[in-house]
A protein has these predicted regions:
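Structural motif
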Residues: 241, 411, 428-430, 449, ...
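Glycine-rich phosphate/ribose-binding loops and adjacent secondary-structure elements
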Residues: 333-335, 432-443, 447, 455-461, ...
Length: 878
């Protein structure tokens, strides 16, 4: 049987999301439950894959099935595509299986041409209708030119602005039919000017080009960035939805809106949305005109509003989740154009999940599974200091579109935001309105401020998804983009001016207001308590200071999975002694210098044990090459020479001798302990003495040090270092006359260690996968240099993700799995964890659960993310 590439809305349902995309599956589902949906069809995600396989062309079979879909639509709707008497006009919209707001392209009013426009006007002499037809036509030419033919929107915007200026009006709605007719002609001329061909008038050709454009938009730069950030595979493809147009811009009895069944910023159980009279859907979402609140719709269209409230209830009860809906009213009649589970802020996600359990819609397991772990990061984001905020006077106010507090220097373009942020500047991106092209700048900014657009504009939706503070629709701003400045309440802001914005209240302030850490609400505790019931993986933290350890404990960490000891050497009072050790000529001189460092290390470790209150602490012995600890500036070298009674030339010779061609694979990790066993001895004494002290002071704590040897690649190497550690530790314990248990394990960060894990496990009490180095060593590229070529790899579709941010499960993951399978049978008591940056990435945590790790360890602020991801992995496995 030939492939079925096209499904009408009557043939699908919500279980067919992978084939029909989210939008198509939900349109079919709404049709099935009897809601007012204009009847159209969906071209499948498989057709998108086929389009790319066929060299970015739509084959005849797909097109012929699409035309059968059009014939079905004609029959159901009683209109004909391209007909002069009763024309069927359609919208063509994308819809991937995962929601990607504003990332892909939409075309409205398709099927119009000069003849159809003339025939429509002839059939209805009402001047308002004539205005509507020309309005629809000029919109179609502009959208088609921009989305399908890639002629920039700006050329058309300039023509509109010029026309409004000539006519002395502020809004598009104030332009007359004659003005819009002139614009349509100007737009077609601009199209020809840009492309050298006439605007296509054949509706079938328009449709084919539009379908191709939606498929093509799956691979546009902003969609690729969004996919990479949201773990959406390139192979999924997008579906295309073709449906009859309903016109919110028909007259003043019509309108369009976007609404959420609950507040997407706070989670409060109340309808939140916006509505525009005499407008098309894109006007609300694109944020071109600032709309009115949804409640006002009751005054304008009482019957349609009453029906809409019923639809909201039906959808929430059907999907058991907060819904984001797009709808249009045409001549007072309601039509539903889309529904999906709404994007929401992290606080809203937690509140909605807890409320849905309380209302009987969800079980605790389902509530835990419905929250995106990455969003939890945003909960822990700063707010303004309350006292400083009270003393500050807002200059103006927009809509609080995405919560949090942001302050920084004003920049006006996405490129400037990226450039300034790369220099270490904190910036706030100020735009008339954002468009999907601004995504990289939005990611680099501390906050986003827009002049136009509501709570459902592009800026608002994307900022909420990224957890970036956003204030939208501040119409009091007088913007001069050309000269990179704006005025608000008489104050002029230029590039680099300091500004603060509050994404919760929408307030805008001059200058920088200090921020404080976020306060976590009750729902967070509830969700985390449920998550902890379901997860099997333990979650530890990577922390080198008591303050970090304490923060991580507050956020639920169950121990330290990685304490990097080298950070402790860099402090002013210790670095001198460590440099003395490096420059020493004999073992005795080295030991003498290390004895000066010992009390510092011991007090550091003691403070960490105290912060962890008996939870496990894994201490990694010295890892970086010694070259990193010596001075490279001549002034400091002179000081060191004077301190040590050496000549400058002698110090320079030592520094020079430590230089390496490839330090990442050089004299570092356990290789330092093999060359200088006295370093490992000193560190062992510090660890054990600190543990003995804390054990004596807190008899009820189970203090059991875990000593971790870095960068092992060979059993004999581990044996050598372990012998130094065990002899030193046992002597300390015997001298103190106490009973203290400790463990010696190793990092697995060299492929050879993973492949010989059955040998290494005979000497190791635990394995900890250092996936930062393991990724570097497996791929053979350096984390510090990969940025230079990774973008080219994304563009060429060689990689979809940064392997340093998201664990490479097929290569690095296979090495981890191999190490566990080889190690555990030899040493059944062996426990295994991960302490690279991947420990806080949800998809990597899920993989760690699958291969049977005992714990993951991540930075303190990612501990809640890992706890939730670990619970979701356990729930998904059931």
């Amino acid at each position: 049987m030939a492939n079925k590439w096209v499904y009408t809305f009557k043939e699908g349902n919500m279980s067919m999301r992978n084939l029909l995309g989210g939008k198509g599956a939900n349109l079919a589902e709404m049709t099935e439950i009897g809601l007012p949906v204009p009847q159209g069809f969906t071209i499948t995600t498989e057709a998108c894959t086929q389009y790319y396989e066929d060299g970015r062309k739509i084959n005849d079979e797909i097109m012929s099935q699409a035309m059968e879909g059009v014939a079905w639509m004609e029959e159901v709707n009683g209109k004909k595509f391209g007909d002069l008497e009763n024309p069927l006009l359609v919208s063509v919209r994308s819809g991937a299986r995962a929601s990607m707001p504003g990332m892909m392209d939409t075309i409205l009013n398709l099927g119009l041409n000069d003849e159809v426009v003339a025939a429509m006007i002839k059939g209805n002499p009402d001047p308002a209708f004539e205005r509507f037809v020309y309005d629809s036509y000029r919109r179609f030419i502009q959208m088609f030119s921009d989305v399908v033919m890639e002629v920039g929107k700006k050329y058309f915007e300039q023509l509109i602005d010029k026309m409004k200026e000539e006519k002395g009006v502020k809004f598009d709605v104030d332009l007359t039919a004659e003005d819009l007719k002139t614009l349509a002609e100007q737009f077609k001329a601009e199209y020809k000017n840009q492309l050298g061909t006439d605007f296509p008038s054949d509706p079938v050709e328009q449709l084919k080009l539009a379908i191709e454009a939606v498929f093509r938009s799956w691979d546009n730069p902003r969609a690729n960035v969004y996919r990479r950030d949201n773990d959406i595979p390139y192979s999924w493809g997008t579906a295309v939805n073709v449906m009859p147009m309903v016109f919110g811009n028909l007259n003043n009895e019509s309108g369009t809106g976007v609404a959420f069944t609950r507040d997407p910023a706070t989670g409060e159980n109340k309808l939140m949305g916006e509505f525009l009279i005499n407008a098309q859907g894109e006007d609300v979402v694109a944020g071109v005109r600032t709309p009115m609140p949804i409640a006002q719709m009751e005054k304008e269209f009482p019957e349609a509003y009453a029906e809409f409230l019923k639809v909201c209830d039906t959808l929430e009860n059907h999907y058991h989740d907060m819904q984001d809906m797009e709808f249009t009213v045409e001549n007072k009649k309601l039509y539903m154009l889309q529904c999906r589970n709404g994007k929401r802020t992290a606080p809203a996600a937690l509140k909605i999940a807890c409320d849905l359990v309380a209302e009987g819609h969800k079980t605790p397991e389902e509530a835990v599974a419905m929250i995106d772990p990455r969003n939890l990061d945003t909960l822990l984001h700063p707010q303004f200091d309350a006292a400083a905020l009270k003393a500050a006077t807002p200059l103006g106010k927009g809509l609080g579109a995405s919560p949090g507090a942001a302050c920084g220097k004003v920049v006006f373009t996405a490129d400037d935001a990226v450039e300034w942020a790369a220099r270490g500047e904190k910036v706030v991106l100020v735009r008339l309105e954002t468009s999907p092209e601004d995504i990289t700048g939005m990611k680099s900014a501390q906050g986003i401020l827009t002049v136009r657009g509501g709570m459902t504009s592009h800026a608002a939706v994307v900022a909420r998804g990224m957890g970036t503070c956003c204030v939208s629709g501040c119409g009091d701003i007088n913007m001069d983009e050309e000269n990179k400045k704006f005025t608000l309440a008489g104050v002029e802001f230029t590039e680099g001016s300091e500004i603060s914005i509050d994404g919760t209240t929408g307030n805008i302030y001059q200058g920088l207001i200090p921020t404080v850490d976020a306060q976590i609400a009750g729902e967070f505790g509830q969700i985390m308590a449920w998550a902890d019931q379901f997860r099997k993986l333990k979650v530890r933290t990577n922390a080198d200071t008591p303050a970090d350890a304490k923060k991580a404990r507050e956020l639920g960490a169950e121990g330290i999975g990685l304490c990097r000891t080298e950070h402790m050497f860099f402090e002013e009072d210790r670095i001198a002694a460590f440099r003395e050790m490096i420059c020493a000529d004999t073992v005795e001189a080295r030991e003498k210098a290390l004895d000066k460092i010992l009390p510092y290390q011991q007090s550091d470790f003691k403070a960490l044990y105290e912060a962890l209150e008996g939870c496990p602490v894994t201490i990694r012995f010295l890892d970086p090459p010694l070259h990193e600890f010596v001075p490279h500036e001549e002034a400091e070298q002179i000081k060191l020479a004077n301190d040590l009674g050496k000549t400058l030339d002698e110090v320079k010779a030592i520094v020079e001798s430590l230089k390496e061609f490839n330090p990442m694979m050089g004299h570092r990790g356990c290789r330092l302990a093999v060359t200088y066993p006295e370093i490992a001895k000193m560190q062992t004494k510090a660890v054990i003495r600190a543990a003995i002290e804390v054990q004596k002071e807190h008899a009820d704590w189970n203090v059991k040090p875990e000593i971790m040897i870095p960068l092992t690649c060979e059993l004999k190497e581990l044996k050598f270092v372990k012998k130094v550690v065990v002899e030193t530790a046992d002597a300390e314990i015997a001298a103190a006359g106490v009973d203290l248990k400790y463990e010696v394990g190793t990092m697995i960060e060299i492929p050879r260690a993973a492949l010989t894990a059955d040998e290494i496990a005979t000497e190791a009490d635990f394995f900890c996968f250092g996936t930062n180095d393991l990724t570097q060593m497996t791929f053979g590229f350096s984390r510090d240099d990969a940025g230079k070529f990774l973008d080219a790899y994304y563009d060429a579709k060689i990689f979809e993700n940064d392997p340093f941010a998201k664990l490479d499960q097929t290569g690095v993951g296979k090495l981890m799995e191999t190490a566990i399978k080889l190690g555990k049978p030899v040493n059944p008591a062996l426990h295994c964890g991960i302490c690279g940056e991947h420990g806080g990435d949800p998809s990597s945590v899920e993989f760690c659960h699958k291969i049977g790790l005992d714990y993951v360890s991540c930075s303190p602020f990612r501990v809640p993310v890992a706890r939730l991801a670990a619970a979701q992995a356990a729930i998904a496995e059931k």
